[in-house]
């Protein structure tokens, strides 16, 4: 069976030399991942051990007032804690006791490290073990770091899921595990497609509730739905699970190849695959063509932000007719992103890490039609006449799989259309 996809480029970017940048950074810290994780994991609570700045970041980013009692909060480190004049561990134990007494619905508690807790070397791993022993088995306490010293934007989710993997029950069952947090409606679409293909059981990490936690073992195969899960990938591999490598499910091509890799693993026939995917593929292709009309022939420059950049560059160049000038990403995990890099035609600079001033110099020299960057860089670049796209929108907006393919293309085409309208109005 032919998948009716464009042929791969004669030479991809998997072996392209990577420009390593190690300078000033401009990116959100890993605490930001709590915003989508607390909505996904419905019996979990995320307790950040940090400063008032951490609390303000979370409250502002989530758009949730504290009196609404969301499933996250901050244990604020005061000056006496930072100065070593108080027993931070004893105070943390008291705060956790009060929290669990007030919120008996909590089954998973995450102690999340921040810049202040890292600076004073507060051992949250040991604290989590101590609190798990005290409050278990009703409540399991985990810990991970969302510190800006150690993590960037999307690494918070990776650190969270990696902390869960060692505690997952062992199983010998042959199961497919989908790894990465997705909006519920998108996750349902993915599971529905896989079920129609006859693949199952399908389990998800993270699960909605602790009682639904998947097992993992030597017969577990897993597919990542987010490209920033390097630590989670390693943790699952150490438990004996095997990764199904594939391009990520962005756009019609990425979704089809992602599904095809899983279908091949489970022996799905070509006829069944075609019958299940033909209609949604056609819808996705039509939607992308309509939404990307203003993108064809234009150039794009990715500044590092979320680790989605190589996959999105593949989508824009292969399905939307754009050319990539530079694809910057905080970390480049070739074992995970290799299939996407194979489909990204050689030519663009691949950069890993960040040196803001050097990268901005390259943006100014290249004059791309669209620059994908963080919030802090967008307005200054717009003031210089560049068209920008906020990278954070690509994480917070549903963009995976067939039904969201047109929306994904639209996220990139809207700023280009807006700039064109403003230029016409200025000319008049």
Swiss-Prot record:
Its cofactor is [4Fe-4S] cluster. One of its GO terms (biological process) is photosynthesis, dark reaction. Keywords: 4Fe-4S, ATP-binding, Bacteriochlorophyll biosynthesis, Chlorophyll biosynthesis, Iron, Iron-sulfur, Metal-binding, Nucleotide-binding, Oxidoreductase, Photosynthesis. The keyword Metal-binding applies. Pathway: Porphyrin-containing compound metabolism; bacteriochlorophyll biosynthesis (light-independent). [4Fe-4S] cluster binds at residues 29, 54, 115. Its EC number is 1.3.7.7. It catalyses: chlorophyllide a + oxidized 2[4Fe-4S]-[ferredoxin] + 2 ADP + 2 phosphate = protochlorophyllide a + reduced 2[4Fe-4S]-[ferredoxin] + 2 ATP + 2 H2O. Binds 1 [4Fe-4S] cluster per heterodimer. The cluster is bound at the heterodimer interface by residues from both subunits. GO terms for molecular function: 4 iron, 4 sulfur cluster binding; ATP binding; metal ion binding; oxidoreductase activity, acting on iron-sulfur proteins as donors; oxidoreductase activity, acting on the CH-CH group of donors, iron-sulfur protein as acceptor. Component of the dark-operative protochlorophyllide reductase (DPOR) that uses Mg-ATP and reduced ferredoxin to reduce ring D of protochlorophyllide (Pchlide) to form chlorophyllide a (Chlide). This reaction is light-independent. The NB-protein (BchN-BchB) is the catalytic component of the complex. Protochlorophyllide reductase is composed of three subunits; BchL, BchN and BchB. Forms a heterotetramer of two BchB and two BchN subunits. Belongs to the BchN/ChlN family. This is Light-independent protochlorophyllide reductase subunit N. It comes from Cereibacter sphaeroides (strain KD131 / KCTC 12085) (Rhodobacter sphaeroides). The lineage of its organism: Bacteria, Pseudomonadati, Pseudomonadota, Alphaproteobacteria, Rhodobacterales. The gene is bchN.
């Amino acid at each position: 069976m032919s998948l009716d996809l464009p042929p791969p480029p004669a030479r991809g970017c998997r072996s392209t030399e990577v420009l390593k940048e190690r300078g000033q950074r401009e990116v959100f810290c890993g605490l930001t991942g709590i915003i989508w994780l607390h909505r996904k994991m419905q019996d979990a609570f995320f307790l950040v051990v940090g400063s008032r700045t951490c609390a303000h970041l979370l409250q502002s980013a989530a758009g949730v007032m504290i009196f609404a009692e969301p499933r996250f909060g901050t244990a604020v480190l005061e000056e006496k804690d930072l100065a070593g004049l108080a027993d931070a561990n004893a105070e943390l134990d008291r705060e956790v006791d009060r929290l669990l007494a007030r919120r008996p619905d909590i089954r998973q508690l995450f102690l999340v490290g921040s810049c202040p807790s890292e600076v004073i070397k507060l051992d949250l791993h040991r604290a989590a073990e101590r609190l798990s022993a005290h409050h278990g088995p009703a409540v399991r306490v985990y810990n991970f770091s969302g510190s800006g010293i150690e993590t960037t934007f999307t690494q918070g989710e990776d650190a969270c899921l990696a902390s869960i993997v060692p505690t997952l029950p062992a199983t010998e069952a042959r199961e497919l595990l989908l790894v990465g947090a997705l909006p519920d409606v998108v996750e349902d679409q993915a599971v529905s497609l896989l079920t129609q293909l006859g693949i199952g059981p399908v389990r998800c990490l993270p699960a909605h509730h602790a009682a639904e936690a998947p097992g993992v073992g030597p017969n577990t195969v897993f597919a990542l739905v987010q490209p920033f899960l390097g630590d989670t990938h390693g943790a699952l591999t150490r438990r004996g699970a095997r990764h199904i490598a594939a391009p990520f499910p962005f756009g019609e091509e990425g979704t089809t190849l992602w599904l095809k890799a899983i279908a091949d693993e489970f022996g799905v026939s070509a006829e069944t695959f075609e019958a299940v995917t033909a209609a949604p593929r056609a819808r996705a292709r039509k939607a992308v063509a309509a939404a990307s009309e203003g993108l064809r022939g234009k150039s794009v420059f990715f500044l590092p932000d979320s680790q989605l950049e190589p996959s999105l560059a593949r989508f824009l160049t292969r399905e939307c007719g754009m050319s990539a000038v530079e694809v910057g990403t905080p970390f480049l995990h070739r074992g995970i992103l290799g299939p996407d890099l194979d489909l990204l035609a050689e030519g663009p600079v691949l950069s890993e890490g960040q040196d803001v001033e050097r990268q901005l110099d390259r943006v100014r020299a290249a004059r791309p039609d669209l620059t994908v960057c963080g919030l802090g860089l967008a307005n200054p670049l717009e003031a210089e006449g560049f068209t920008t796209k906020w990278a954070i929108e690509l994480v917070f907006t549903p963009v995976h799989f067939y039904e969201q393919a047109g929306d994904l293309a639209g996220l990139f085409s809207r700023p280009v259309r807006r700039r064109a309208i403003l230029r016409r109005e200025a000319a008049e």
